[in-house]
Amino acid sequence: MAESVTIARPYAEALFRTAKESGNLAKWSEQVSLLGQVAANPDVSSAIGDPNVAAPQLVDLFRSACGTAVDAELSNFIQLLSNNDRLGLLPEIAGLYETYKRAEEGTKQADIVSAFPIDDNQVKALIPQLEAVFKTKLEAAVSVDPTLIGGIKVIVGDQMLDASVRGKLDAMATALNN
């Protein structure tokens, strides 16, 4: 994993610089994310790793999977990655691109894990409170984990705020056992 991120970094940096020069980081973000999702698809991933599938076939596969959602510049990027046998790095490239984009915008990703599904209005109400706690602008990524029993757990970078019932029970168990 660490090696693939190291190899993916120059591609992601070049892609980010190009997107920044075009002045449309958000549009490129959507397209790069789509490419990463396509590459992470198990069928596509196995095709990428199959030595019997030629580079032009892989490029055609990506172009047909993405359709018109990917513009000509990113289509050329797919061609470049294919020629260098790097299509399998697209999920890492997409992740690094998002990291660079957030750094440019001064935001961080808040991974919000809830015991129960929460709607967009609840997330919108929660974000300003979390921004005050973490002292940074946040973008939310929400997931559900019923094992939390109740409450939420928020992870921003290397910081975690655990306001879940499971977290409280674990803390009590630790206190009682020590």
Curated annotation (Swiss-Prot):
Subcellular location, record wording: Cell inner membrane
GO MF, one annotated term: proton-transporting ATP synthase activity, rotational mechanism
GO cellular component assignments: plasma membrane; proton-transporting ATP synthase complex
Major location (coarse): membrane
SUPFAM superfamilies (alphabetical): N-terminal domain of the delta subunit of the F1F0-ATP synthase
Membrane topology label: Peripheral membrane protein
Keywords, comma-separated and alphabetical: ATP synthesis, Cell inner membrane, Cell membrane, CF(1), Hydrogen ion transport, Ion transport, Membrane, Transport
Signal sequence coordinates: none
Pfam families xrefs: OSCP
Domain of life per record: Bacteria
Family of the protein in this entry: Belongs to the ATPase delta chain family.
Function: F(1)F(0) ATP synthase produces ATP from ADP in the presence of a proton or sodium gradient. F-type ATPases consist of two structural domains, F(1) containing the extramembraneous catalytic core and F(0) containing the membrane proton channel, linked together by a central stalk and a peripheral stalk. During catalysis, ATP synthesis in the catalytic domain of F(1) is coupled via a rotary mechanism of the central stalk subunits to proton translocation. This protein is part of the stalk that links CF(0) to CF(1). It either transmits conformational changes from CF(0) to CF(1) or is implicated in proton conduction.
HAMAP family per UniProt: ATP_synth_delta_bact
PANTHER family to which the protein is assigned, alphabetical: ATP SYNTHASE DELTA CHAIN
Subunit structure: F-type ATPases have 2 components, F(1) - the catalytic core - and F(0) - the membrane proton channel. F(1) has five subunits: alpha(3), beta(3), gamma(1), delta(1), epsilon(1). F(0) has three main subunits: a(1), b(2) and c(10-14). The alpha and beta chains form an alternating ring which encloses part of the gamma chain. F(1) is attached to F(0) by a central stalk formed by the gamma and epsilon chains, while a peripheral stalk is formed by the delta and b chains.
Record-given protein name: ATP synthase subunit delta
Biological source species: Dechloromonas aromatica (strain RCB)
Phylogenetic lineage: Bacteria, Pseudomonadati, Pseudomonadota, Betaproteobacteria, Rhodocyclales
